[in-house]
């Protein structure tokens, strides 16, 4: 097991590359080696490599080949006219702690690969062609991408095709641009887990959506924050699909836009859509499809979701389907269902036990408190800090700050919560002020915030815009911590100038 060091500034390809003082200079030199299981290739922080990195050899499950970084400073950067990192047929590979930007193709491309992990990789400005996903895997097995960031790319954020075993965990995608770009596009794949991601298509120059799943099998999409786009989650022709506990908003590009949609491109069966907060968009859950197609839509269960600020109904069913819409919470002013008469008369899609409330935010805060209390009671041996997603909705503005508290729906085992980080900055004893896309916000350690809208920054069109701020909390002594996001939704139709 050998560690090879590569430094674009001080290295030389005449060196042996086996210690930091005798590092190689180029990735092509590494490619000339026959890497063995357990070997590592570490790129010096601060280095810039203007070449594609081809991974040709495989590790083993117990001794993967690792591509990472060393030293201090900013992450090493790979630029390339082709892909950033490219591999065919290699197995048992770990890629971590790098940045890939300004590449002509994909940031990372893997074809017919097995057991890959991509961790803490920053990918930006990829794809001179819109056909290239920033992270692309095809015909592969067991691929995990976690804690990575994709931003301002031309093409899909993730393009996954015919992969058995996919995990996308705790990633961020912002602005996947292009005429066919989604934050995540996944076709003909199975055993899928998409969890804990923040995917934002609010400012993307794309008519598409956030997550597009085509013919998924055994898929779970949970605990994500999905914002913007023509749709939130399009899950077509799937088998055994769970979509739960997501925050989905800002999907209002078209009259047909939806938070969750299914029924197109083939038969769909066994969907569980539950625990989601669906708001600030057009349709909620849309069970639909093309006219004349004979697709079946079987056992579609929509339950325990919360719907508010929708211009269309929380549930739309206009094609033959069987299932149920039960125990959902719908804010007054939002239409509950739009079910075609033929389907209603067939009694194949039942509606029961749903609730209408005056204020969804109050209901959500109460539910979060109950869940936190129950979690603490049942798991005293495993204390933790839990942060919950926060929303600020601005319908009118008179120049005064819009106020709230980030911590009131969070919880900790010792009943102490402190706001430590907001955006990319630490929160000091005098608080912190940041300037956002549409206004400025001041926060303090107690979680209080004051958002002041700057109407001069708003676009000229009507409708909605939004921006998000990440934040981190702990229990006062940093033994336990968690993080989440505040999303500010601005309804421009009602603003007072």
What kind of feature is each model-predicted range?
Residues 3, 38-40, 46, 64, ...:
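Detector for repetitive beta-architecture
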Residues 24, 42, 49-51, 58-108, ...:
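Right-handed parallel beta-helix/beta-spiral solenoid domain characteristic of secreted/periplasmic
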Residues 321-381:
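Acidic, glycine- and Ser/Thr-rich low-complexity intrinsically disordered tracts
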Residues 1-28, 45-47, 70:
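Right-handed parallel beta-helix/beta-solenoid
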Residues 51-54, 79-84, 103-109, 127-134, ...:
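Short glycine/acidic-rich loop motifs that flank beta-strands on beta-rich extracellular proteins
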Residues 381-434:
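Extracellular ectodomain surface segments
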Residues 431-493:
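Acidic, turn/loop-rich segments in luminal/extracellular domains of secretory-pathway
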């Amino acid at each position: 097991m050998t560690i090879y060091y590569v430094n674009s500034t001080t290295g030389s390809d005449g060196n042996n590359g086996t210690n930091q003082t005798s590092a190689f200079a180029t990735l092509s030199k590494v490619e000339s080696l026959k890497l063995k299981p357990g070997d590592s290739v570490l790129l010096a922080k601060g280095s810039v490599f203007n070449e594609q990195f081809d991974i040709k050899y495989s590790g083993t499950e117990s001794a993967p080949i690792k591509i990472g970084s060393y030293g201090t400073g900013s992450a090493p950067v790979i630029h390339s006219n082709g892909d950033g990192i490219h591999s065919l047929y290699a197995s048992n590979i770990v890629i971590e702690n790098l940045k890939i930007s300004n590449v002509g193709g994909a940031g990372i491309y893997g074809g017919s690969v097995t057991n890959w992990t991509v961790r803490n990789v920053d990918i930006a400005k990829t794809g001179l062609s819109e056909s290239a996903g920033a992270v692309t895997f095809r015909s592969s097995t067991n691929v995990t991408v976690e804690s990575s960031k994709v931003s301002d790319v031309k093409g899909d954020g993730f393009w996954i095709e015919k992969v058995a075993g996919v995990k996308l965990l705790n990633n961020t995608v912002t602005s996947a641009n292009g005429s066919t770009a989604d934050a995540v596009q996944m076709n003909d794949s199975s055993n899928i887990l998409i969890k804990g991601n923040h995917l934002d298509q609010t400012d993307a120059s794309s008519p598409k959506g956030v997550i597009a799943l085509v013919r998924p099998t055994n898929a779970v999409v949970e605990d994500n924050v999905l914002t913007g786009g023509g749709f939130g989650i399009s899950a077509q022709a799937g088998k055994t699909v769970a979509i739960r506990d997501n925050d989905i908003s800002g999907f209002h590009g078209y009259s047909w836009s939806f938070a969750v949609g299914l029924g197109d491109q083939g038969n769909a069966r066994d969907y569980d859509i539950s625990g989601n907060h669906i708001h600030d968009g057009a349709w909620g859950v849309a069970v639909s499809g093309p006219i004349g197609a004979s697709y079946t839509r079987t056992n579609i269960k929509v339950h325990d979701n919360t719907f508010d600020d929708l211009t269309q109904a929380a549930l739309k069913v206009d094609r033959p389907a069987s299932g149920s819409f039960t125990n959902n919470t719908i804010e007054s002013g939002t239409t509950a269902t739009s079910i075609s008469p033929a389907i209603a008369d067939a009694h194949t899609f039942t509606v029961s036990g749903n609730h209408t409330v005056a204020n969804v935010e109050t209901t959500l805060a109460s539910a979060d408190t109950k869940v936190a209390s129950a979690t603490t009671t049942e798991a005293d041996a495993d204390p933790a800090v839990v942060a919950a997603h926060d929303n600020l909705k601005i319908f009118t503005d008179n120049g005064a700050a819009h106020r709230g508290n980030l911590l009131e729906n969070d919880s900790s085992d010792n009943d102490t919560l402190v706001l430590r980080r907001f955006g990319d900055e630490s929160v000091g004893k005098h608080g912190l002020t940041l300037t956002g896309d549409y206004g400025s916000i001041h926060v303090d350690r107690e979680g209080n915030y004051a958002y002041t809208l700057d109407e001069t920054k708003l676009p000229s069109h009507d409708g909605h815009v939004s921006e998000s701020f990440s934040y981190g909390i702990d229990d006062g002594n940093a033994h336990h911590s968690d993080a989440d996001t505040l999303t500010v939704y601005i309804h421009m139709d009602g603003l007072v100038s």
